[in-house]
Structure formats: C-alpha cells, structure tokens
C-alpha cells in the first residue's frame, strides 16, 4: 500500500545508532503483534502501539521499507571490525568473537531476513515488522531527564533521520516471517552490555544506573524473550543453505530497562518497548497482560560474531588480540531540532578485557569498589554457559536490592584506582550461593593503572617495599664495586698510576674524565658532574659522550682494560655507562637520588637513538626534574649562578651532596667569608627593609692582620646613619674590605667579578667568588697607592680577592682605617705585571703561565740569593722557565741560562711587551680580575683579545678568570719533556737528538705560536708581527765571566766594551786565557762561551734547536728515541744552528701524527729537507771545528774529519767506491749513509778542498765530567780526544752510525 512521502534525510551508514535502535523496536513490535493476534486487549498499556489510539494505527506510519530505514546500499566490509571503535562505545563478548566473517550491512540483513516471504500476502505482524516507523512519534515525545530516584529512565531518543518512503511493491510474506520467527525463537537469545560499534546509546545513563537481569542458570530454556539490563539484542540472519540451519549475525543495542524486583517476572519485549515510550515502570499487573507461550518465546541464538569493540584477549588459535574501546566520537546523525533539547549524560571510560574464549563480558574489568559490575547473560550455544555466575550491577534506585551488600558507590575518576585497592585487571564476579568459586585468568595486555606512585621525598631512596637496594651491603676492605649489583673486584690502591690519579683527583675542582673506585670520595665526582650538567656554558652531553682521555688518564684506562679482560661479568653490565661517572652502586648504597642525574645524563649522551637536539631536550628535562634536589635554595631561573653550596646549614636537605673540597672552601673563606661573618660598612638606602636587617649586624672581620678584641662593644648611632658610631669600649672595629653581594645588586663601580655572558673558554667561577663584593669607597681607599698604576687600577675592582689581600696587608688605625701597606716588596713583586704594558688597550696577546715554586719573573730576592736553593727542576711540569725558553727559541735544561735556578736577576721581556705581549702569572695580584678586565675592555672597543694559555688543565685555579668565546683562546701547556733530551735522557744523545724539540699544536711552542700569529695577522694586518719564537725576545741575567749579573746574550760590541779592556796589556797569560776563554769550548751548555764565539755572536748567545712536529697529541713520536725516523735523527745529529736573534725556528716535516713525511730514498730526503745548517769559521778565527760542551763534560766536535796528506790519493779513493762497497754500505744503513753522502756532496768538505779527503760530521769526545765545564779555573788540563767522525771510506761510515739504525754506542777507531 501507499505511504505518504516523508522528508528524506542524509543517508546513514549501516550500523548507525538510530537504525539499530529501530531494529530493536521492530523486534519488540513483532513480538507484540504476535501477542495481539492471540489476546485482544484494548485497555492495557501495550495497546499503546496497536490499539485504537496506538502509535502505529495511522497509515502514515505503516509502510516504510527496511532499505529506506537503513539508508545505505549493501556493501561488503572486509576490514577488521574493531578499528573504528572508541573507548566509550561497546564491549565485546570474547576476543574470539571478532575472528569471524565480516559484518553485513543492515540493508543486506533485512533483505535476507525478508527474502523468504515470497509473494504471499503479509500478515499484520509482518507488516508491522516491515513498515513500522516511530521516528516522528518518538521525537515529539520529550521527557524530562532521569533523576536519581528513577530507575531505568532516560532522555527521549532522537528522531531517526534515516526514515524515508519506499515503493509499496516490497514483497513481504507472512509465512516466511512466521517461519523465520519460529527459527529464531528456538535459539537462545544473547545479550551484551554494550552498544554496537561506534554507536552510542540513545539513552545515556549514569555509570551506576543499571538494570538487573533476573536470569538464573537454567532460565535459558525458559522459552520467553529475555533482555538484559543493558539492552535488548537484535539479530540478523542470512539465507540458509540447503539442509543447514541459517547462519546468523549479531547486532547488539543497549535499551535501558527498569530494575526488576527479586522473584519478579522477566520483562518481555513489549513491556520494554512500553517502558521506552512511556518512560515509566510497568505496573504490577503487567505480567497478566503479557502472556507468552513457552513454545514460541524461546530465546533466539546468535553466532557470537557481532559488531563489538576490540579488547585484549586471545583468539582460538592462541594469537593475542588487543582490542580496546577508545573514548571519543559519536557517529550518530544530528537529531532534528526540537523544542526540548536532548540531554545526554557523559559516559565514563570502561577498560575491559578478555582472557580466554570461554570468558564472558559479564566479568567486570574495573575494580569492584570503583566500577559497577556488569551483567553477562546468554551463551554462544544453548546451555554452554548455564553455570556462569553473574555479578549484578548496582542501580540508583533506593528500593533495588541488586546492589552487592558489601559494595559501596564511589565516584572515582575514570582510569584511576586506589593504590591499596585490588587489581582491576583481575576479573571479579559474585558467586551464587552454594556455587564453588572459580579462578579467573588475568589479562596480559590491559593498560596499567595511571595512579601516580610517588616515593618518599625525604630520606634515603629505597626500594618500593622499603628494603635496601641489592648490593648495598658494606664492602670488604680490599674490594671495590664492579659489574652488576653486588659484584666486586680487588682494589689496586698501591699501584703507582692509581696513586698519581688519586693525587690529581684530590687537587682537581673539575670532574675527572676517568673515575675508578680506587680514587675514593665519589661524592666529589658526583658534585662536580652535577655542576657540569647545570653549567650554562658547558656542553655536558658532548663531554660525557667523549671525555677525551689523554696522557696519564689514557694510560690508566689501558691499565684497567688489561687488568679486567673481557671474561668478567662486568663487561656486559659495568654499573656506569661513561668513564667519568662512578659506579651506580655508590648511589644505591647511600640512597642518594640526586646521584642518579649523572647516570641518566650519561646514558642519554651515550645513546645512539637521539640526535643532538633531542639529547639536549632530554638534558634540559633532567635539569628541571632534578633542580629542586640539586639546588634546593634556588629562587631564580639560573640556580647555578645564585646558590652557594659552600656553607651547609642545618636545614640542608639530605639529597644535597656535601662540599667536595674543604680545603678549597677554606681558601675561599679567607677571601669571601660566609654570611654569618660578613657585614656591610653602611646601609644602602635602596635596600629593602628585609635585606637591611640581615646586613646591619656588626660582624667579625676576616682580615688576617686585623686585631679585634672579644669584648668590643659598639652601640648604634641614635642620630643619622652617616654619622660615626659611638665607641663605648675598645678600639674601632674596621669594616671588612669584602662583603657579600647586596640584595639589590652591586654598584657599577663596586668591586665584584664580572662574568661575561654567553659561552666561555674557561670554567665558570664558583658562586662564592661571584658573591664577593667590595664597596666603591673601600676600593678607592685600597687602590690609592703608587704601587698600582692608574691605568690598571680598574682591574683590581674586577677581583674582590685581590682587594681583600690588599686590605689584609694594611694595618688598621683609629683615624685612618687603611694605612700604608705592610710587606711592600712582596706586594710590588706581585703587581709588577702592571708595568709591562702601560696602557691596557695596547695589549694584543696575553700569555698565562703557572710558575713553579721559586720561579718569579722579577728574579730571585737579593736577600735570599745566597741562601735560597732556588726552584726545583721538574721534567713533567713546565713553568716560567720553559715558557721563556720557548719564546726565545732555545733549550731549557737545568744547566742552561734559561733555567730560573741560574738567574741572578729578572729576565728581560721588554721586546715582547713592545709588540703587545703581556705575560701574566696565576700567582700575580688580581690575576682573574686582569683577564676579565682585559676581555671586557677590549670587547667594548670591538677588539678581540688573543690569549695563549700555557697552564695545564689540572693546574687551572679554582676560581680562575672567565673568558668569553668572543676572544681567541689557545690552550697549549708548557711541557719540558717536549725536549728529546728530557724525554729520553739516556738515549737522546747517542741517537743524535740532543738538540731536538718536539712541536705540537697542543704544546707551548712553534706550532701553537703559529696559530696565534695567524690570528694576530688577521686581526691586526697593519701592525708589526708578533715574532714569538725568536732569540731576541728574552734576555737573562746570569753569572758569567763578565760579571755576576750579566745580561745575556751580551752583544759583541758590549762584550768588547766591557770584557776586553780588563785584559788589555795583561802580562799574565793564564789570567788572560781564563778571562777570555781561550782554548775553551765554543759553546758551553748551549750558549756561546769562547772568545771567538762571544766576539762573533755575543757572550751567552744560545744555539737554536731543531723542531720536529709530532702531531696534535704530545708524545706521539714514540716511547723511545729510536722510534724517530732515521732521516730526522741524521739531520738533527749533523745540524748545528748558530745563534741568530731574528731567525725563525727551524721546523722539519712531521715525524709523527696524521701526516708523516716518508722518503723512499736519500735523494728524496735531500730534495725535501732543507740543507743541514752548519757553523763555518772563516780563516783567521782558529780551527775549523766547532766544539760543544755539555753539562756532564762531554764534547761534541763538529767539522771536517778524516783528512790526509795526499789529497789526490784521498780524493781518488773517494771516487773509487765500487758498486759492491756502496751496496754494502746501504745494506748496513741505507738512510744513514745515503743521507750523509747526499748532504755532504752539496755542502761538504771534500769538494771545497779545505780538508782533502774529509767529510763534515760530528765527533763525540769523552772527558772527565766537570773538567772542561769549570769557567773559573785557569788553563784546563789537556785531555785525550777520541775522535769519532765520518770519513770518506765506507768502512768508517759503518762505524760512525753503529750499523743498521745507528743505535749502537759509538766505537773508537785506531
């Protein structure tokens, strides 16, 4: 029949909420129609549908086809059904239910359902199933929202917009419909507690508003249509195959139902529909009005493959299925606007699980105390789950007895549970009386509880159960921690390398790059690492990833690698991911949570999973997380710049590590006393009232020379603050020169450390040093002295420590607070650097050095010159002497003029000062302030300061200067062992390396000078070059035959002026010979000594060394002198560089490192290397040989040797070298003989005719030690000279070089 057209809305997808709810109503209406055919009643509530005034009487509500209701055409779905679900949607019966065939759209379901009707005339029931439309009626029947007292009520469902008219030609058969319903009634009906996928319930109920199904084990065969408290289940069927029962699909929709009284009847579908329409609870007599036949009302069976959300579980094949309903989207169409808005209560999150194929969704996944338990009714097959117990859900109704007697309703935030409550992942059900309990299987993939578990914030960090960590027991006295938790190894405290490393560790203020348990005191290393992590100008990630072990640290690392081979258990688990970080067992044993920060930072730094930006993000997160523990008293964004950790208070948290250096703290206290020992000279008007109360107290002065009696009583002035106080007893208490930084900030002209902003080349000074402050008035009184040049006085205001020292040397007085300084001479020597360059802006290069004890650029004191033994020589630590020797291009040995122990006066560095080079010692007054002042002064003039740091890293002062990276900074420590004779004292002379010096870019010498000179040329292109490594840069004051304080080198003119007149006309030849050095060696201890040498180059003029580059790493040339290439040893053995104050250093190609010069033949070496420098004496100056004398009396004779009275014969003999002899010589030592002949043919003796038949070489003369060394004796006794020279015979050449390699001791020939 025809139906009036209805406005067609936007088609909905299959499975939309309104369509499925309509299907539920259709099933209920079908059952009601069957009942109406048997029992005719007109006054009962169920006539509301089909009665006289029923909803479905009108023609306009009768003919609506199922495809129009669904609004979609059939389309196959092959994707997984759980992919579009949300958490607030629906729950699944079991994980295995999702493994079936895909979901069939509703249009296809209904087409299949009614396809068997054929062309027969549809009955009223079939017509009602086919053409029911309740949309208009439902949408126009608004009801008030459910309140707490009403059970099972909800808001009015929205109008289903999928309704549309359809052609009346749809064939519907009554018989088919009856047969189909008969088949369906014979199958047990299954219910769920969730809605269809992606389809929120029409009536949104509160979490605790639940209906209770009265179904018991055995009611499944009761024969009446049953619905659970959460909703009515509608089914879909497919066309049955030949001889097989039809295979059906399951669609589940939630319909709110009223609570059932204990023992009451089970509400049927019509009663449920009536409840939805009337929004009221059925009357007590509803049971008589709704008689159902047991043979027609059997529950219908489903194949347990409905549209349900994914939940954790296992499929039948054992493969885990992780389906989870996520919160979120509502796929329902927008309802038609109505006068009464639809109110929907939000649904809470539900976390559900499935543990096995036999489990039911009736088991709750929430906690019994936190979440209401759901109802699970029905089974996959008839009677398969008849024995399953069900946990009823509590209802909001007061008269409902379905609530568990022991359960209480709680409003817990979804997703959270109590820490002390039971595990929500364990399914819990209510056992029936007399039913044995069953053990539920736990789910393995549930989301864990998000309840924060916060450990105690105070006290040591223990395990969650409060027990100590594994391996925290005290260790035996001879064991240290190593490897996994609880494992140890033997300690090696007595090893020499370990003892040296421990000494360096105790003296260092920075974290050591290699920490071993034998060093002890891990708190010091942890504190240093934490300071490094929070340092704003350092890169802890780069340093922790590669601390660059060099020198002694590398040797110590190799020692432990050999000591602990890869067979130990600790090779896989070492307890520390980076070498600077101590074993984590130390932190676990002490329970120090803060010590985990270096381990976490090191783990991030060593990880390959993050790039640089990601690592620094994690580092910044760690800084924020641990800031409250590392700096508990911090109040700003930069805690490392404002916290003083040197003075622990009684309120210091347990997580704060103690001060790692008590001795350093004591030294700092002498400069900047703690807060309880400081006071300000006067109040500042700009200070807040709170800060004034802290600084108004008169406190003890920390100055060493200040004498303050214990009974001094000073009363405050009653009048103006500026007036002096009234003295009641005792002398006046002098105010301290240095106080703490005022709370309102320092004055612009006050005395404090000016730390430049941004990245720094040097370590950041401590917070205590930065808090020291001196008032401008005090500075003016302290620096107003002729000792301090006016131009350099601002540098003193940059160093409060220097001001405190100046104040300590001034005695106090009654009227004059700052008298003349005591110890003027000592103070003058410490500020002598201010007189090197008058104007600070004329400084171009700043050289920083660390002098040895006893070294002073001002020379030795006159009073202690005779008694003071002088400085002690150190072969490993370079001080002022090594620095000046490198600048003057000469050797520095204990017997040379360059060593400070031989000085009788101050060295002269005026030549360097004239070119803008300032030498500053770490012990000079205001050392830190001078560097920071020069950096600030030149930066303000937009100029860059060149800084050459000759201080070893471990010798850097604790609160040293902070130098900005705006300036040029080169670190090149001075190393005495760069000289071959110091590095190999036993073999350097025999190998020909007596005057060889190894150069490196990281060693103070020509290589590092080249970097500075290049930068200088770029910054100051129009100025005179620095010329650092030149003989004329430094002049020494030593004792020579010209006098006890002779400035050397003494020029030849000065030598003739001051020395020769004393011996003019002298008749005593012995005295004349002693005074002029007649017959003495030309050079003694590398300096010109004889008369002809002094008359030519000047007295004390030094020979120049030969520099051999060895790469960036010092010591890379090899552990022995023989490791130096042969061509380098041959060159150094024959080379003799005469004194030249303006000559550049002679640097050969590298002998070690990345680029090593390799020569395949002697000719290649001759062409690549420069000619061997030699000393040639013109006629009339005596013998042609040049004699050198060492400190041990050994003489080296350089010249032409092996001459003969028959020149032609000798020359012919030289030319008659047979091929056999040449091959034999090269076989013995190819390099030695080849290089010698090659250079001799160009330079040497046999060709110039001066010494026929000879060649140029060196001979070693052995004499008694010290005989030829004494310069104050008369004529030296004659000595026996054993000549060892290179001659023109191949037989002699073999003897000269000692066979292959030239490493045999020299042999004398008769």
UniProtKB/Swiss-Prot annotation:
User: What organism does the record attribute this protein to?
Assistant: Varicella-zoster virus (strain Dumas)
- Anything else the record notes? Encoded both by ORF62 and ORF71 within the inverted repeat sequences bounding the Us region of the VZV genome.
Give the location in the cell: Host nucleus; Host cytoplasm; Virion tegument
Question: Which family, according to UniProt?
Answer: Belongs to the herpesviridae ICP4 family.
* Keyword terms, alphabetized: Activator, DNA-binding, Early protein, Host cytoplasm, Host nucleus, Phosphoprotein, Transcription, Transcription regulation, Virion, Virion tegument
A GO molecular-function annotation: DNA binding
**What Gene Ontology terms describe where this protein resides (cellular component)?**
host cell cytoplasm; host cell nucleus; viral tegument
Please describe the quaternary structure of this protein. Interacts with IE4 and IE63. Interacts with host USF1 and SP1.
Q: Where is this region: Disordered?
A: 117-271, 285-454, 636-697, 1193-1258, 1282-1310
This chain's protein is named Major viral transcription factor ICP4 homolog
As annotated in the record, motif Nuclear localization signal runs over: 677-685
